[in-house]
């Protein structure tokens, strides 16, 4: 997985910290939305935790790529995501999240925000909201 970390540093020069974690919400939601290629969050005040987002009115997307044991294939899938301007992390289906920031505070804020949003959306599914 080192290749995925170094790829982010190459493709996002402003990134000085890359975080990668695995949680129940990340795993389940990435599997649930893998076919859509992303999860979209709209209307959450917490969206403002992401650099450049000033309002809850917009949509924040969290891309999802298919998992592969072939790191070259996985890196190619991830590289295609970086054509997008505004995104702060991505999910590998059935695996976990990668997120980044200019420093640990920013990277951790992005990670914590995504984790909350994923848990909120997972709860909405279970409550059929």
Spans of features found by a protein language model:
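Glycine-rich flexible loops
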Residues: 1-129
């Amino acid at each position: 997985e080192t290749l995925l970390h170094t790829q982010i540093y190459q493709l996002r020069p402003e990134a000085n910290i890359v975080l990668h974690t695995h949680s129940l919400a990340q795993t389940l939601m990435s599997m649930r939305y893998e076919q859509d290629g992303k999860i979209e969050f709209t209307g959450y005040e917490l969206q403002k935790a992401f650099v450049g987002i000033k309002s809850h009115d917009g949509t924040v997307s969290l891309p999802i790529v298919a998992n592969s044991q072939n790191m070259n294939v996985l890196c190619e899938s991830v590289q295609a995501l970086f054509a997008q301007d505004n995104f702060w992390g991505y999910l590998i289906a059935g695996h976990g999240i990668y997120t980044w920031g200019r420093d640990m505070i920013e990277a951790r804020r992005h990670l914590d925000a995504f984790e909350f949003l994923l848990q909120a959306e997972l709860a909405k599914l279970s409550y059929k909201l």
